[in-house]
From Swiss-Prot:
<keyword id="KW-0276">Fatty acid metabolism</keyword>
<comment type="subunit">
    <text>Heterotetramer of two alpha chains (FadJ) and two beta chains (FadI).</text>
</comment>
<dbReference type="InterPro" id="IPR036291">
    <property type="entry name" value="NAD(P)-bd_dom_sf"/>
</dbReference>
<feature type="site" description="Important for catalytic activity">
    <location>
        <position position="118"/>
    </location>
</feature>
<dbReference type="InterPro" id="IPR050136">
    <property type="entry name" value="FA_oxidation_alpha_subunit"/>
</dbReference>
<keyword id="KW-0443">Lipid metabolism</keyword>
<keyword id="KW-0963">Cytoplasm</keyword>
<dbReference type="GO" id="GO:0006635">
    <property type="term" value="P:fatty acid beta-oxidation"/>
</dbReference>
<dbReference type="GO" id="GO:0070403">
    <property type="term" value="F:NAD+ binding"/>
</dbReference>
<comment type="function">
    <text>Catalyzes the formation of a hydroxyacyl-CoA by addition of water on enoyl-CoA. Also exhibits 3-hydroxyacyl-CoA epimerase and 3-hydroxyacyl-CoA dehydrogenase activities.</text>
</comment>
<comment type="similarity">
    <text>In the central section; belongs to the 3-hydroxyacyl-CoA dehydrogenase family.</text>
</comment>
<feature type="region of interest" description="3-hydroxyacyl-CoA dehydrogenase">
    <location>
        <begin position="306"/>
        <end position="714"/>
    </location>
</feature>
<feature type="site" description="Important for catalytic activity">
    <location>
        <position position="140"/>
    </location>
</feature>
<keyword id="KW-0520">NAD</keyword>
<dbReference type="InterPro" id="IPR001753">
    <property type="entry name" value="Enoyl-CoA_hydra/iso"/>
</dbReference>
<dbReference type="Pfam" id="PF00378">
    <property type="entry name" value="ECH_1"/>
</dbReference>
<keyword id="KW-0511">Multifunctional enzyme</keyword>
């Protein structure tokens, strides 16, 4: 049976051809290699019909134009040459669209990304909707690739080289108003008239490319170009620390096209695409993409979730305010906040106001939409309005008795079906539910700060939590825009448990004489977004170290931190960024204020600050402990799979994405190599580096954590 076509042609009475994109059986339109013959058949018909005045590409999907190319095509390539051929085929198809003698217009609604934007760039004009769902971008760099169907050549010529480089190097997505301002699209219209607006544009002569701003014209010239690429290259190297080869190749390919012409540019683009597709960095980043997609589809349990119509939140502090924001503004659910005083409620409301007002100022949101979203949030100092809430999220202080009291109050004041979800970061959920009348409806829901930015949540059922409670909580997390992993109710759960030994080792090296900036720089060079010492400052030293005694009590000496260091710092009223002094000093709020290491730290903790370790040695000590703890968590079934372990580390603490997560990284090194490194470190520095039994057994058997499956790139 022949598969239905993803591209269909209809010719209107006014001789405008409408090409409708609708990939059968898929929510999102993605481009596949087999579609090329369909498009070419349509192009042939267009060329044969001499009556046609213009062509419009439009999507039949409700919320996307084309979300990109099907990434599985790249995974199916075994060599750089095969991937290069894939790119050249894409370039050729786009060239054939562009070569049509009549105006070709893209009518864009929803996501227009990657190969979708490259198709739109091959058209002679573009019209998009003013809908918030409409975004345009080239995110290939986030998969360790570059745009391979002409995007590196067409975009700089359309909007200017400096603006194009920013888009391609960062994967930045533009909203409609930004796109029209930059000249990426010709017009922005309401969704209701998108097709007619595109048709009207198609009836005119080909839209002439508008002149670039003077600055962009200067930067495209030989002198300006040399200066621009030198500056951007330096900035990019600092940002990526040389860990992402795609950025270097993007600069090279764009510059080639500008200096030597589009023919050379397209050739360089295809070759670079093929080579990048075979890099371990791209394979790791694509694996993370596939894993996160799978996690987002995972319901958490086999039971059907309960209905979710409204949510309550206990506590209007930083976490409570953030949770209220994502619940109302991302999930679209009514939220009722309870706090013991009105100031707490005001704080939570202001949190959402600040987030939404920022969007209004950046013109990402209309004022009317801001007001509509804010209207979903209300507050109270008692349980008024809580009687019929489907799920309550508790975000009060880390105190077991207080949280147990919250459970009792919710059971007394809410419906019998209400779920109680605790945002605890360290207390066992089983203990919180110990005196509950309905323990099957108590669960952990651990958000990370800042709530609106951190993509991960940990969902923690205790022994008596029902399958439906798990499924309902997972459902809420997804509606909030989060990536949820279900973890076992053991001290530290997963993310904090693998993070603690990593930070402890950094503090221990500090006491041994390593300098703060050397430790942090070493881990940033390794690939983390910030170093462990700075991370502790950002989280809050008082908050970040609170969990350490809990973990040491649960797991023993390998979690012991240099107690004198922590106590000395806290006794000196150093809490980190939040009070302006921690390991670093922070200037007054403002654009020019920069953090700097406080030299007073060294005498305070009795350290010399004259280190002997190289950056790789520093990174090795911190990272090996994290890897070992991740394997311990898998062995103890704290995480359900290596997939969840990799996603939890990358999304929860910024484990370098280009390494694919702890388990992918172990597989790339080989379990035997990692065990040998840890045994050497154990001899040098102590028993905390002793590899866990599962690690040793896998090493002896030559096994890897990730097994080859249909969806797994090896």
């Amino acid at each position: 049976m022949e598969m239905a076509s993803a591209f269909t042609l209809n010719v209107r009475l006014d001789n405008i051809a409408i090409i409708t994109i609708d990939v059968p059986g898929e929510k999102m339109n993605t481009l596949k290699a087999e579609f090329a013959s369909q498009v070419r058949a349509i192009i042939k018909q267009l060329r044969e019909n001499k009556e046609l005045r213009g062509v419009v590409f439009v999507s039949a999907k409700p919320d996307n134009f084309i979300a990109g190319a099907d990434i599985n095509m790249i995974g199916n390539c075994k060599t750089a040459q095969e991937a290069e051929v894939l790119a050249r085929q894409g370039q050729q198809l786009m060239a054939e669209i562009h070569a049509l003698p009549i105006p070709v217009i893209a009518a864009i609604h929803g996501a227009c990304l990657g190969g979708g934007l490259e198709l739109a760039l091959a058209c002679h004009g573009r019209v998009c909707t003013d809908d918030p769902k409409t975004v345009l971008g080239l995110p290939e760099v986030q998969l360790g690739l570059l745009p391979g169907s002409g995007g590196t050549q067409r975009l700089p010529r359309l909007i200017g080289v400096s603006t194009a480089l920013e888009m391609i190097l960062t994967g930045k997505q533009l909203r409609a108003k930004q796109a029209v301002k930059l000249g990426l699209v010709d017009d922005v219209v309401p969704h209701s008239i998108l097709l007619e607006a595109a048709v009207e544009l198609a009836k005119q002569d080909r839209p002439s490319s508008r002149p670039l701003p003077v600055r962009e014209r200067i930067l495209a010239g030989p002198l300006g170009r040399a200066l621009l690429f030198k500056m951007v290259g330096k900035k990019t190297e600092h940002k990526t620390q040389g860990n992402y080869p795609a950025t270097e190749r993007i600069l090279e390919v764009v510059e080639t096209g500008l200096a030597q012409g589009t023919s050379s540019g397209y050739d360089a683009e295809a070759r670079a695409f093929g080579e990048l597709a075979m890099t371990p960095q791209s394979q790791a980043l694509r694996n993370i993409f596939f894993a996160s997609t799978e996690v987002k589809k995972d319901p958490g349990s086999d039971a059907p979730p309960a209905p979710l119509n409204s949510v309550g939140i206990l506590g209007g502090g930083l976490m409570g305010g953030g949770i209220a924001y994502v619940t109302a503004c991302k999930a679209g659910l009514p939220v009722r906040i309870k706090d013991i005083n009105p100031q707490g409620i005001n704080h939570a409301l202001k949190y959402s106001w600040d987030q939404l007002e920022g969007k209004v100022r950046r013109r990402h949101l209309k004022a009317s939409e801001r007001d509509k979203q804010l209207a979903l949030i209300s507050g109270t100092t008692d349980y008024c309005g809580f009687a019929h809430r489907d799920l309550i999220i508790e975000a009060v202080f880390e105190n077991l008795e207080l949280k147990q009291q919250m459970v009792a109050e919710v059971e007394q004041n809410c419906a019998t079906h209400t779920i109680f979800a605790s945002n605890t970061s360290s207390l066992p959920i089983g203990d919180i539910a110990a005196h509950a009348a309905r323990p099957e409806q108590v669960i952990g829901l651990h958000f990370f700060s800042p709530v609106e930015k951190m993509p991960l949540v940990e969902i923690i059922p205790h022994a008596s939590t029902s399958a439906q409670t798990i499924a309902t909580t997972v459902k809420l997390a997804k509606k909030q825009g989060k990536t949820p992993i279900v973890v076992r109710d053991k001290a530290g759960f997963y993310v904090n448990r693998i993070l603690a030994p990593y930070i402890n080792e950094a503090i221990r090296m500090l006491t041994e004489g390593e300098r703060i900036e050397h430790i942090d720089t070493a881990l940033v060079k390794f690939g983390f977004p910030v170093g462990p010492i700075q991370l502790l400052d950002e989280v809050g030293i008082d908050t970040g170290t609170k969990i350490m005694p809990v973990l040491e009590a649960a797991y023993g000496e390998r979690f012991s931190a240099p107690a004198n260091v922590v106590s000395s710092i806290l006794n000196d009223d150093r809490k980190g960024r939040k009070n302006g002094r921690g390991f670093y000093l922070y200037g007054q709020k403002g654009r020019k204020s920069k953090k700097q290491v406080d030299p007073a730290i060294y005498p305070l903790i009795g350290a010399q600050g004259q280190g002997r370790l190289s950056a790789p040695q520093v990174a090795e000590r911190c990272v090996m402990l994290m890897l070992n703890e991740a394997v311990c968590c898998l062995d103890e079934q704290v995480i359900r799979s290596v997939r969840d372990g990799d996603i939890g580390a990358v999304f929860g603490i910024g484990f370098p994405p280009f390494l694919g997560g702890p388990f992918r990284y172990i597989d790339s090194l080989g379990a035997g190599e990692v065990v040998a490194i840890m045994q050497r470190l154990a001899t040098q520095y102590g028993s905390r580096f002793t590899p866990c039994n599962r690690f040793v057994e896998m090493s002896e058997r030559g096994e890897s954590f990730w097994k080859t499956t249909a969806t797994d790139l090896q």
